[in-house]
Design a protein with these regions (language model features):
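Rossmann-like dinucleotide-binding cores of NAD(P)H-dependent redox enzymes
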Residues: 1-48, 109-115, 123-158
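General small-molecule cofactor/ligand-binding pocket signal
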Residues: 23-25, 52, 167
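FAD-site-proximal beta/loop scaffold in flavoenzymes
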Residues: 51-128
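Cytosolic Rossmann-like ligand/nucleotide-binding regulatory domains
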Residues: 160-167
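Short phosphate-binding/catalytic loops that engage adenosine nucleotides
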Residues: 22, 77, 164
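Active-site lining segments that contact anionic ligands and/or coordinate catalytic metals
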Residues: 38, 95, 163
Length: 167
C-alpha cells in the first residue's frame, strides 16, 4: 500500500490498518461509486468485477502532473512520462528563463523538496553561486498516517538493485 517504502513497512502498515477495520483493494480500477442507502463501489481487480459496501472510500492515485493544456508544447518545453517537466539540477527547463519546481518536475513529490527546489531556482535566477540538487536519494520522506512512516535513503529493493549488500 506504500510502494516506495520497504516491503516490511508496507506489510506492517496494512496489518495495522486492518486492525482498525480498514479494507483494501490494491491495483483496482473503480468503475462506479453508488450513493444509495449505503455507499458502494464497483471495481475490477485481477480481471474480476467486485462490489464493496462501505462507509468511506479513499482512492490513492499517486502523483500526476497537472500540465495538460497549459501551453508547454507551444513553448517547446520538454516533458517526460505522464507530463512531468524535465529540469536540470538548478530546476532549469530546456527553455532559457523557465524553471519548474515541485510536483510538476516529478523528482520527489514532497513539500519540503519543492521548497528546496524553489530556493535553488530563486538563487539561480538571482545569479547566486548555488549548489544544485542532483541526488534525491537522501531526502527524508514521510507518510502522514497512523502509525506514522518516515524514511531516508534507499529502500531495501533499491539497494539490492544497485548491487549493495544489506542486513
Amino acid at each position: 500500500i506504500v510502494p516506495k517504502e520497504d516491503e516490511d513497512i508496507s506489510i506492517e502498515l496494512e496489518k495495522q490498518f486492518k486492525n482498525q477495520g480498514i479494507e483494501f483493494a490494491t491495483s483496482a480500477k473503480i468503475s462506479k461509486v453508488i450513493h444509495g442507502k449505503e455507499l458502494s463501489i464497483e471495481y475490477m481487480v485481477e480481471g474480476k468485477n467486485e462490489v464493496f459496501n462501505c462507509e468511506k472510500v479513499l482512492l490513492g492515485v499517486g502523483v500526476q502532473p497537472n500540465s495538460d493544456d497549459i501551453g508547454l508544447e507551444n513553448l517547446g518545453i520538454k516533458t517526460y512520462g505522464p507530463g512531468f517537466i524535465e529540469v536540470d539540477e538548478y530546476m532549469k527547463t530546456n527553455i532559457n528563463g523557465i524553471y519548474a519546481v515541485g510536483d510538476i518536475n516529478g523528482k520527489l513529490p514532497l513539500a519540503h523538496v519543492a521548497f528546496d527546489q524553489g530556493v535553488v531556482a530563486a538563487e539561480t535566477i538571482a545569479g547566486e553561486n548555488v549548489e544544485g540538487i542532483d541526488d534525491y536519494s537522501n531526502m527524508p520522506k514521510c507518510t502522514y498516517c497512523q502509525p506514522q512512516i518516515a524514511s531516508i535513503g534507499l529502500s531495501e529493493k533499491e539497494a539490492r538493485e544497485k548491487g549493495l549488500s544489506i542486513k
